[in-house]
Amino acid sequence: MTDARVLHVDIRPWSDGDLPLLERLLGDPAMMTYLGGPESPAKIRERHARYCRPSDTARVFAVVVGPERQAVGWVGLWEKEVRGQRVWETGWSVLPESQGQGIGARATAIVLERARAEGRYQFIHAFPSVENAPSNAICRKLGFTLHEEGDFEYPPGHMMRCNDWRLDLRAPVEKARR
């Protein structure tokens, strides 16, 4: 894959044809190291069906790269209540062969721009595992502030130690998509 500085990164709505991508992302033990392990085929199909039905409160996009718009991951945002306040939460996942090229950061920056333009909530949060250095680096690069470290239940029934990164969507925009 080409370097992300010259590689075009974009997002598009999640579609029925993205199930094999989701199976690779969520069914791979290495990809799910920080998230409680791989999901079962039934859970992946259930999640895929949800991803195909965007709503005002949750949207998932395929991350696409290059002129051929090859799907290499997902990025999304959904409503969450944090300390009694409604906010956006964001998350992302990129295939191993496409990691380390800035693709996840650039795709997440696009989602942040959309959330900012929508103006619904002041804050967007991300909750990567404290051990997930690449995802924590994306938060830092995109201008999130480390709010606190805490325990987070994900998936249901599995507690993980995570960082609560927060970005003020109403603050002046930094040049995060360099």
Per-range role (PLM):
Residues 30-50:
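Conserved GNAT-fold acetyl-CoA-binding loop/helix
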Residues 41-45, 53-55, 66, 94:
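Juxtamembrane/interface motifs at transmembrane-helix termini
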Residues 39-41, 50-52, 89-91, 165:
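Short, charged/polar low-complexity linear motifs in solvent-exposed/disordered segments
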Residues 1-27, 34, 60, 64-178:
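Acyl-donor (CoA/ACP) binding surface of acyl/acetyltransferases
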Residues 50-62:
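A short helix-loop-beta-strand connector motif used in the catalytic cores of GNAT acetyltransferases and
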